[in-house]
């Protein structure tokens, strides 16, 4: 699979962290699939997060948002 060049804002992220990747979130002790990576402003708190990572459990479920530095690659199956 040939991937498209990363947007400039994403170029400082580790190469394994991209949309569609399976990752592990130690804060929730869960594996998830990366749905989107981008800048995000929480509408409730007005706090801004650069390169927020939107995750969803494999197989579906409720999405959550984490900072990229909080994640690691998921173990191989």
Predicted regions and their residues:
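Mixed-charge, Lys/Arg-rich low-complexity intrinsically disordered regions
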Residues: 1-19
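Intrinsically disordered, low-complexity, charged/polar segments
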Residues: 2-6, 51-77
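Short coil-to-beta transition motif at edge beta-strands of beta-rich domains
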Residues: 13-31
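Short solvent-exposed loop/turn micro-motifs enriched in small/polar/acidic residues
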Residues: 15-16, 48, 64
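Primarily hydrophobic membrane-targeting regions of prokaryotic envelope proteins
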Residues: 19-24, 36, 54-55
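A short, compositionally biased micro-patch
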Residues: 26-27, 48, 58
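Short beta-strand-centered aromatic/proline hotspots
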Residues: 29-43
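Short, solvent-exposed secondary-structure boundary/capping segments
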Residues: 41-52
């Amino acid at each position: 699979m040939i991937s498209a060049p990363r947007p400039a804002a994403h170029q400082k992220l580790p190469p394994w962290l991209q949309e569609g990747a399976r990752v592990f979130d130690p804060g929730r002790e869960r594996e998830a699939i990366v749905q989107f990576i981008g800048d995000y402003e929480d509408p409730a708190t007005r706090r801004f997060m650069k390169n927020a990572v939107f995750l969803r459990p494999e197989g579906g479920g409720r999405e959550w948002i984490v900072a990229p530095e909080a994640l690691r690659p998921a173990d191989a199956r």
